[in-house]
């Protein structure tokens, strides 16, 4: 006989959460903030009760976030103090170097900067407030909402799309006219060059 274990849910101060990536899309954060702000206190509580933040326990029992960085940043900026986390793995017995190596090999971190360049683990911010804006990550989020690709379970799939767009659409063009850049992104997403990306939903034959 096997016993199914329920995930352990713990309230944690948002300011204490540790990122496992360097960037977020600040447009995505703004959308999360709007969503939170538009709800009543009761609805916000219900939302937070169904959107637990997954974490890995690291050295000193610190909570390292493996998903929902945009939500965590939005909560921080909206002044919401605590969020429920679900611990997916306890690696608190490891030293710092071993811990980050495990995160990296398990696909639980994304140490790439706003230019798509891989950085040393020390470049990962220690707080959600220090996450850097990557406009191409915002484009990837909007692209998925517009049907450019399907939601996928591949870790950090939106960052793969962000890097695809980064190599093809000029950053100044994105800053100058986001909507126009999105039209180009939507067209690119259906092409064969994007066929290797998770959630690709372009034509499979000519």
What feature does the model see in each segment?
Residues 64-67:
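Short hydrophobic beta-strand that contains or immediately precedes a catalytic carboxylate
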Residues 2-46, 50-57, 61-62, 76-206:
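Surface-exposed, charge/polar-rich loops and edge strands
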């Amino acid at each position: 006989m096997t016993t199914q274990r329920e995930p352990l849910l713990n309230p944690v101060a948002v300011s204490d959460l540790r990122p496992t990536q360097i960037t977020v899309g600040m447009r995505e954060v703004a959308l999360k903030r709007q969503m939170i702000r538009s709800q009543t206190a009761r609805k916000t509580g219900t939302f937070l009760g169904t959107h637990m933040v997954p974490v890995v326990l690291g050295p000193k029992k610190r909570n390292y976030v493996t998903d929902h960085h945009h939500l965590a940043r939005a909560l921080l900026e909206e002044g919401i103090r605590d969020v429920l986390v679900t611990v997916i793995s306890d690696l608190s017995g490891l030293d710092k170097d071993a811990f980050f190596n495990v995160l990296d090999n398990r696909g639980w971190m994304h140490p790439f900067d706003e230019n798509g360049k891989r950085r040393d683990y020390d470049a990962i911010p220690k707080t959600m407030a220090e996450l850097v804006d990557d406009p191409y990550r915002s484009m990837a989020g909007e692209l998925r909402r517009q049907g450019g690709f399907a939601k996928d379970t591949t870790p950090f799939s939106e960052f793969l799309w962000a890097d695809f767009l980064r190599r093809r659409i000029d950053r100044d063009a994105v800053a100058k006219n986001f909507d126009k850049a999105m039209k180009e992104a939507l067209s690119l997403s259906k092409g064969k060059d994007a066929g290797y990306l998770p959630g690709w939903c372009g034509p499979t034959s000519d």
